[in-house]
Amino acid sequence: MTDIRLYMLQSGTLKCKVHNIKMNQGNGADYEIPVPFYLITHPDGHTIIDGGNAIEVATDPRGHWGGICDVYWPVLDKDKGCVDQVKALGFDPAEVRYVVQSHLHLDHTGAIGRFPNATHIVQRAEYEYAFTPDWFAGGGYIRKDFDRPGLKWQFLNGTQDDFYDVYGDGTLTTIFSPGHAMGHQSFLVRLPSSEPLLLTIDAAYTLDHWEEKALPGFLASTVDTVRSVQKLRTIAERTGANVVTGHDPAAWSTFKKAPEYYS
């Protein structure tokens, strides 16, 4: 039987400016942020959360992403794609049962279509918006990453399906947290021997967002962004969860990384 574990992994970094992450801050200063993704191992099949950057940006960033590279430049080694890192840990990609998407922005879609037996779980609102984004959001969605034939999708419907229990045993619960993206969701991970972990993903890029000291540099709705953080803070308080923000370089460095794990 496979132990229930959470592995924290990273698919390179993004080079950008402070104000791209913390609205109206930084005076144009350069900033480099990690691009995390997560592997949950489970006796009923494994889960990838997001998958980070698509491996194609390791060799042809501008060819794959286009003009958004002028704002966010991906740095990724050719052997650090999602699938290669899962294999390096000794896991068979065919044993991945779920690919769970927080949202469909370009630095979170590296697992879609890469695991042959996976059901892809995403918010319906996010999936639909990704095909017809508004002008200000279009650069963040790379359609060829998620518009792939033959994939199995499972759609969640906002508050109607909130706190969806992926395995049915409490290990992985989705939390609808729109604002950064139309259909963003965060995740509560409960493990046998560790305190719960609340993966905010991009509902809170950094601890500044979490502590309500700054707004994200990109958002679809300011009001929803603020209210989603408030919702997640309440959940963290009630569950005693350790909070893992989405792209905070300093905070990310404090967590165990694969091959170490939480269990």
Swiss-Prot record:
This is N-acyl homoserine lactonase AttM. Its cofactor is Zn(2+). It catalyses: an N-acyl-L-homoserine lactone + H2O = an N-acyl-L-homoserine + H(+). Its EC number is 3.1.1.81. Coiled coil: none annotated. The lineage of its organism: Bacteria, Pseudomonadati, Pseudomonadota, Alphaproteobacteria, Hyphomicrobiales. Keywords: Hydrolase, Metal-binding, Plasmid, Zinc. Binds 2 Zn(2+) ions per subunit. InterPro entries: AHLLactAttM (IPR054889), MBL_superfamily_lactonases (IPR051013), Metallo-B-lactamas (IPR001279), RibonucZ/Hydroxyglut_hydro (IPR036866). The gene is attM. Belongs to the metallo-beta-lactamase superfamily. One of its GO terms (molecular function) is acyl-L-homoserine-lactone lactonohydrolase activity. The keyword Metal-binding applies. PANTHER family: 102 KBASES UNSTABLE REGION: FROM 1 TO 119443, QUORUM-QUENCHING LACTONASE YTNP-RELATED-RELATED. Zn(2+) 2 binds at D107, H108, D202, H247. Zn(2+) 1 binds at H103, H105, H180, D202.
